[in-house]
Amino acid sequence: GFSAFSCPELVSIAGSLSADAASKLTSFDMPKLKSLSGVNFVKLTSFSDFSIFEPFIKDNQITEPNWIVSGCKYNPTYQDMIDGKYKPAE
């Protein structure tokens, strides 16, 4: 598997960004992404930094029913994201 997922020119994802059982994945690099309405991450056992999703939570593009995270290295709830807990406490 790969540890980084990079889409430098991606601007919009219609729907949710989904990833399942990518055990080595630690980061997403999508600097131009402006549109995203959900996250579905299951069993990303090395992934723990969800700060890339902060703008989509803050402007309500991603709503609670569309925030699905389980079995990852860190599993923030939707409320955790609202509270700014994008990665595990150090």
What are these regions (language model features)?
Residues 1-89:
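Concave beta-strand-loop units of leucine-rich repeat
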